[in-house]
Amino acid sequence: MGHKVNPIGMRLQVNRTWDSRWYADTKDYGNLLLEDLAIREFIKEECKQAGVARVIIERPHKKCRVTIHTARPGVIIGKKGADIETLRKKLANMTDSELHLNIVEVRKPEMDAQLVAESIAQQLERRVSFRRAMKRAVQNSMRMGALGIRVNVAGRLGGAEIARTEWYREGRVPLHTLRADIDYALAEASTPYGIIGIKVWIFKGEILEHDPQARDRKAQELQDGPAPRGAGGRR
């Protein structure tokens, strides 16, 4: 029986690209990598209530461009932009480069694996039944247009003495098909009985062209809806 590799890593440079997009000399690479990790960890803690799905870091010449994909941009921006300015200043202190901060709204959080996994984790921490949380997440994703979804939860489910793994799937999730657009995420729920791990796979369709940027464009189209006819480009 084969092991399941990370679907995102398997599809890099096929229909998905990296979340850190920069090049550095050997002597600078380690420092910039640690800086990236520190920025991501800080955003994860600082914007815990904002539903952060993805953080993209780009480094053009002597600049650092951070793009936060979030389900609740208003929580990050704050009243009259006060909170985002505070966040930008804190992030600027973590890097020597000129920092630019962008916020992108995720309009369909039910179609984002990271947000679905974190939603299940929050429900488990509130002592909601794991089966109910899994089923609700699967139904919401399928209703919003997913072609398939699988949810795994592992740990001392329901306070059981022995840890086990339960899963729920609807539709199809073709992990071996490289052209399949599969979003994957992992989250953890801290319960009185220990840590429960949640894994989510969401199948959104197939991307036929060999283009690392294709998934980002397709995700944006799913968020914005189909372009009107005659708006340019081939139909």
Swiss-Prot record:
MF term (GO), any: mRNA binding
GO biological process, one term: translation
CDD domains xref list: KH-II_30S_S3
Domain KH type-2 as annotated: residue spans: 39-107
Record key words, sorted: Ribonucleoprotein, Ribosomal protein, RNA-binding, rRNA-binding
Database matches in Pfam families: KH_2, Ribosomal_S3_C
Entry GO terms, CC: cytosolic small ribosomal subunit
Disulfide bond positions: none
Renumbered residue ranges of the record's region Disordered: 213-235
InterPro entries given in the database record: KH_dom, KH_dom-like_a/b, KH_dom_type_2, KH_sf_prok-type, Ribosomal_S3_C_sf, Ribosomal_uS3_bac-typ, Ribosomal_uS3_C, Ribosomal_uS3_CS
Subunit details: Part of the 30S ribosomal subunit. Forms a tight complex with proteins S10 and S14.
Function, in words: Binds the lower part of the 30S subunit head. Binds mRNA in the 70S ribosome, positioning it for translation.
Protein family (similarity comment): Belongs to the universal ribosomal protein uS3 family.
PANTHER family according to UniProt: 30S/40S RIBOSOMAL PROTEIN S3, SMALL RIBOSOMAL SUBUNIT PROTEIN US3C
Listed name of the protein: Small ribosomal subunit protein uS3
Species whose genome carries this gene: Ruegeria pomeroyi (strain ATCC 700808 / DSM 15171 / DSS-3)
Source organism phylogeny: Bacteria, Pseudomonadati, Pseudomonadota, Alphaproteobacteria, Rhodobacterales
Gene: rpsC
